[in-house]
Amino acid sequence: MDQRMNGVDPKMLELLVCPLTNGRLTLNRENNELVSEKARLAYPIRDGIPIMLVSEARKIED
């Protein structure tokens, strides 16, 4: 699946960082989320727009 399938511009994904840690994010295509491994948070992508609010992020459990 191409990154454009989720409606997010790949160039924008390169610029985004975790608002909590300022760390790198990786795209989880299966769940349509941007994942911060350092913060253990997954930020949702809704209608092609990354929701970069900690309050909206899902905690990643082990």
From Swiss-Prot:
* Annotated Gene Ontology cellular component terms: cytosol
Q: Print the organism lineage.
A: Bacteria, Pseudomonadati, Pseudomonadota, Alphaproteobacteria, Hyphomicrobiales
- Please identify the protein, giving its name as recorded: UPF0434 protein Avi_4243
| Lineage top rank: taxon | Bacteria
Instruction: Write out the similarity annotation.
Output: Belongs to the UPF0434 family.
